[in-house]
Amino acid sequence: MIQVLLVIICLAVFPYQGSSIILESGNINDYEIVYPKKVAVLPTGAMNSVHPCCDPVTCEPREGEHCISGPCCRNCKFLNAGTICKKAMLDGLNDYCTGISSDCPRNRYKGKEDD
């Protein structure tokens, strides 16, 4: 059996750098499928993320921050409910932030065929 050390890079949306977790010494069977034995998280600061909202180890928002990126995320916080996140096109209906998510939900008055 071949012993391998796999490194999976957790990518933050901006700037496409994040942290790593290491899957230690997994075995590869005849079909080259990896069965890891143990997951070891790198210590805090092992990799430095240049994104101010992203914890470099967990790729999650830092303590006290709400989000990392998205149309309803600015300076690591959710935009206020009612903030326009997508301007109206042909249908004349804007999409608005909810204040509790970094996503830009579809305006509930838009039909399924509208976008």
Curated annotation (Swiss-Prot):
Keyword terms: Cell adhesion impairing toxin, Disulfide bond, Secreted, Signal, Toxin
Gene3D superfamilies named among the record's database cross-references: Disintegrin domain
UniProt superkingdom: Eukaryota
Stored SMART domains: DISIN
Residue ranges the record assigns to the propeptide: 21-47
Role this protein plays: Potently inhibits adhesion of alpha-4/beta-1 (ITGA4/ITGB1) and alpha-9/beta-1 (ITGA9/ITGB1) integrins to VCAM1, and adhesion of alpha-5/beta-1 (ITGA5/ITGB1) integrin to fibronectin. Has a much less effect on alpha-IIb/beta-3 (ITGA2B/ITGB3) integrin. Also potently inhibits neutrophil migration across TNF-alpha-activated human umbilical endothelial cells.
Assembly and oligomerization: Heterodimer with subunit beta; disulfide-linked.
Protein name from the UniProt record: Disintegrin EC6 subunit alpha
Organism ancestry: Eukaryota, Metazoa, Chordata, Craniata, Vertebrata
